[in-house]
Amino acid sequence: DVIPDGPTTPEIAYQMVKDETFAQTQPRLNLATFVTTWMDDYATKLMNEAININYIDETEYPRIAVMNAKCINIMANLWNSPEQAQWKAGALAIGSSEACMLGGVAAWLRWRERRLAQGKPVDKPNFVISAGFQVVWEKFAQLWQIEMRQVPLTQEHITLDPQDALKMCDENTICIVPIQGVTWTGLNDDVEALDKALDAYNAKTGYDIPIHVDAASGGFILPF
């Protein structure tokens, strides 16, 4: 666990990594994975040729920034975004975990801004999610010190039950997180039913609790 005194040849370094990872699960046999396990040769070629490009540097790589914006537009149009702007609002993420982090932070900041404007405390935020969450939500709760309230999954309710979720909400709830492709079962939480129930709840309580949909694996399927 220390930096070696001398260099290692590329061949040996390669073999060391191959040997270290040999016994672990092969990606194509991992039914729990959320990533692509096979790509066309041209996709692999493009990735290899772009491996040294720091795409976040839009000044030096402006065409990649345009391509990113086009991808956001495609997603916005797919989901019938009402935005009229040429370039729709959105953000790119390396994977679903980063997307969850960004969505959670956005919900927390909106809640915090609203509470501060009302002169109310902001020290006890929480969010509501089913017990079938992916692990990034636990990390989000730990990193940002936000209470995670878990709605149990039962034989009667094998996806997020809207009424059970609402029972866990209060004025400090930054959002409710339905999941599309629950890790345990692959099933989808009913976003439409939750949205209707939450609209009624917000109207009754005066709260403004939003929904953040964790698209997970279901986000690749539901639009089609």
Q: Where are the regions a protein language model picked out?
A:
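N-terminal entrance/gating region of PLP-dependent enzymes' catalytic architecture
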Residues: 1-88
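Conserved aromatic-histidine-acidic binding/catalytic patches
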Residues: 55-63, 88-95, 125, 182, ...
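Short loop-beta-helix segment that forms the pyridoxal 5′-phosphate
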Residues: 75-103, 151
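Conserved PLP-enzyme active-site core in the AAT-like
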Residues: 95-224
